[in-house]
């Protein structure tokens, strides 16, 4: 949904981008799922479930809720030993380096859908762009699946995009991409869980900070520190755009016993970690950081495999929180 403030920022060029992107066919990968938005497909007759590959705004019944809770209880009964848990947390950058070393830039697809879900990222009107500088910072930028579309579609002369990632390999791959523009974009390696960020910009300077499937990869006890620093570097009135895994997502239910580090926090087979949030948890942490809620959506989708007759329930959480003026 477009807010009044965001719609006034969009000129003719910005709206053309949104319309063009809305008509794209979307690729699906592990973490880069297209959110539901305008033109959502809602299942009203259960007999039609296998007519399409996906359905939006799916409501769970009591039986599904109980089954999901039972699956999580089963896979989290046996927690990982402290020594093993410490190794995964300490070596997190190494596991992500290994991940990107194997997959390069092929695993995740560019997030062109961000312009429809977060129109604040769409190009400014030509007259506004000349007069209004913008600074956007992405935490956990990976190989540029957000940054590259931003650079591709915006011709704003005063747009500056920053990005950081745990993984030195990811940053190396991003810098090597044809679409990367070092005049408009600066990326660097940084551990966002540190108390003090080493960044090439001042506090209270960023118009937008983007976090897409990033906070879930961080140890829960360090999450608040990350959001506190987001608040510190947002300008007054600046916006934090966020999307991540929700509680009882299919990915959580599929974990085997022995992969649980602590409640709702798991390690994947490749050594990377993932947490599954509730809306209450996110609202609490964002508010504690000093941010004000503008949007908090639990996005429930049903994906189906029509050949195998499988139903797969996905849960993501999408938020917009603003730093007060």
Curated annotation (Swiss-Prot):
Name of protein: tRNA N(3)-methylcytidine methyltransferase Mettl2
Tissue-specificity statement: Widely expressed. Expressed in ovaries, head, thorax and abdomen of adult flies, and in the CNS of third instar larvae. Isoform 2 is predominantly expressed in larvae and in adult tissues that have been tested.
Cross-referenced PANTHER family: METHYLTRANSFERASE-RELATED, TRNA N(3)-METHYLCYTIDINE METHYLTRANSFERASE METTL2
Quaternary structure, from the entry: Interacts with Psn.
Gene: Mettl2
Binding sites annotated in the UniProt record for S-adenosyl-L-homocysteine: 100, 112, 138, 140, 165, 191, 212
GO molecular function per UniProt: tRNA (cytidine) methyltransferase activity; tRNA (cytidine-3-)-methyltransferase activity
Protein purpose: Probable methyltransferase.
Domain of life: Eukaryota
A Pfam short name: Methyltransf_12
Species whose genome carries this gene: Drosophila melanogaster
């Amino acid at each position: 949904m477009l807010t009044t403030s965001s719609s006034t920022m969009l000129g003719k060029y910005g709206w053309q981008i949104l319309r063009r992107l809305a008509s794209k066919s979307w690729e699906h990968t592990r973490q880069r799922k297209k959110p539901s938005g305008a033109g959502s497909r809602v299942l009203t007759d259960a007999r039609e479930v296998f007519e399409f590959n996906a359905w939006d705004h799916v409501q769970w019944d009591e039986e599904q809720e109980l089954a999901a809770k039972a699956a999580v209880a089963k896979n989290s009964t046996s927690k990982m030993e402290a020594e093993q848990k410490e190794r995964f947390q300490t070596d997190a950058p190494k596991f992500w380096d290994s991940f990107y070393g194997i997959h390069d830039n092929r695993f995740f697809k560019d997030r062109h859908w961000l312009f429809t879900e977060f129109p604040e990222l769409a190009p400014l009107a030509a007259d506004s762009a000349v007069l209004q500088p913008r600074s956007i910072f992405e935490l956990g930028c990976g190989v540029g699946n957000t940054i590259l579309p931003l650079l591709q579609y915006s011709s704003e002369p005063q747009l500056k995009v920053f990005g950081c990632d745990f993984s030195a390999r990811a940053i190396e791959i991003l810098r090597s991409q044809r679409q990367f523009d070092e005049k408009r974009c600066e990326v660097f390696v940084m551990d966002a869980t540190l108390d003090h960020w080493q960044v090439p910009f001042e506090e209270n300077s960023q118009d937008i900070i983007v976090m897409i499937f990033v906070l879930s990869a961080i140890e829960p006890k360090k999450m608040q520190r990350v959001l506190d620093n987001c608040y510190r570097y947002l300008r007054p009135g600046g916006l934090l755009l966020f999307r991540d895994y929700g509680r009882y997502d299919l990915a959580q239910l599929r974990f085997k016993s022995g992969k649980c580090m602590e409640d709702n926090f798991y390690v994947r087979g490749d050594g990377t970690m993932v947490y599954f949030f509730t809306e209450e948890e996110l609202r609490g942490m964002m508010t504690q950081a000093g941010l004000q809620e503008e949007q908090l959506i639990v996005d429930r989708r049903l994906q189906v495999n029509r050949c195998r007759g499988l139903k797969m329930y996905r849960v993501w959480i999408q938020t917009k929180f603003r730093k007060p003026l």
